[in-house]
Design a protein with these regions (language model features):
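Alpha/beta enzyme core
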Residues: 2-289
Length: 289
């Protein structure tokens, strides 16, 4: 496929995103993993797209995000960039693409920028990841942090559950947010953090955009998993998701109708296939003799 025709809007940039924050205009952010979905998200006016390692679950059928590889992420991000040339695209650093060392983190962040045309990268973790953030930013790559529920370490956190409900844990998240900001993160995603904890972090942010995924309305913007919006992930529906339309039901209905029409010889109809003229068909039969 070729690159989608760009929308007329100007592509969001770091300055324009910070201007939205200054003007109290919430930032819209969705996950995306493929060309056609990226095209529609750009046409809808979504500010940012996250090519999340959640693709391991939503697109590849794994039970966690851990199996996603850098090659998986690059290939899907390339498709998204072609579909949304005028949208701010963020590449999600997959498991073990940044944890081993600062050098590994910089190298893989660079792949997102050079091979996939990303505008920024995101990685999970708190204070322990500040040196990775700092190294990536020093290399000239915009970097986002991710706190609260961090799916790559969900097992250590006790599963997919709210983080920061206790005062001590909430304090650690607040401290980590400030540390990531000081390390150079321009955005921090708070996933499944209590709303008032998110509000405290947002109010304390000086030069950092705070985004919410299930963390309430007080952040500078919202992120949702695209498949959750339309009932496209059959294994479970997160409480934090809002279903804006059940595309899964529509797709299933269409698939069942297709199977029924083929098995009963009602598809294809004349408008669904191509024919050869009688003259050319007669010539073909003569050639075959």
């Amino acid at each position: 496929m070729t690159e989608a025709k760009p929308t007329e809007r100007k592509k969001p940039t770091l300055p324009s995103l910070f201007k939205k924050v200054a003007d109290s205009v919430p930032i819209t952010w969705l996950t995306c993993y493929d060309y056609p979905t990226a095209y529609f998200q750009e046409q809808a006016g979504v500010d940012m797209i996250l090519v999340g390692d959640s693709l391991a679950m939503t697109m590849l059928g794994y039970d966690s995000t851990l199996p996603a590889t850098m090659d998986d992420m690059i290939r899907h991000t390339q498709a998204v960039r072609r579909g949304a040339p005028n949208t701010f695209v963020v590449g999600d650093m997959p498991y073990m693409s940044y944890q081993p060392s600062v050098e590994t983190a910089i190298r893989n962040a660079g792949r997102f920028m050079a091979e996939a045309g990303c505008d920024a990268i995101k990685l999970e973790g708190g204070v322990e990841m500040c040196d990775r953030i700092r190294g990536i930013v020093d290399a000239g790559i915009p970097a986002m942090g991710h706190l609260g529920l961090t799916p790559q370490s969900a097992s250590a956190l006790g599963g997919f559950r709210v983080q920061g409900k206790g005062a001590e844990q909430a304090k650690r998240i607040i401290d980590s947010a400030k540390a990531l900001e000081k390390a150079g993160a321009f955005t921090i995603l708070l996933e499944m953090v209590p709303d008032r904890v998110c509000e405290l972090i947002t109010k304390r942010a000086e030069n950092c955009i705070i985004m919410s995924l299930g963390s309430g309305p007080h952040a500078h913007g919202q992120l949702l998993i695209y498949h959750d919006l339309f009932g496209l992930y059959p294994k479970f529906k997160p409480r934090m998701a809002k279903v804006y339309g059940n595309a899964g039901e529509v797709i299933l209905k269409g698939l069942k109708q297709y199977v029924q029409e083929v098995t009963t010889h009602t598809f294809p109809q004349r408008e669904n296939y191509f024919t050869i003229t009688d003259e050319e068909y007669d010539r073909l039969l003569k050639i075959l003799k």
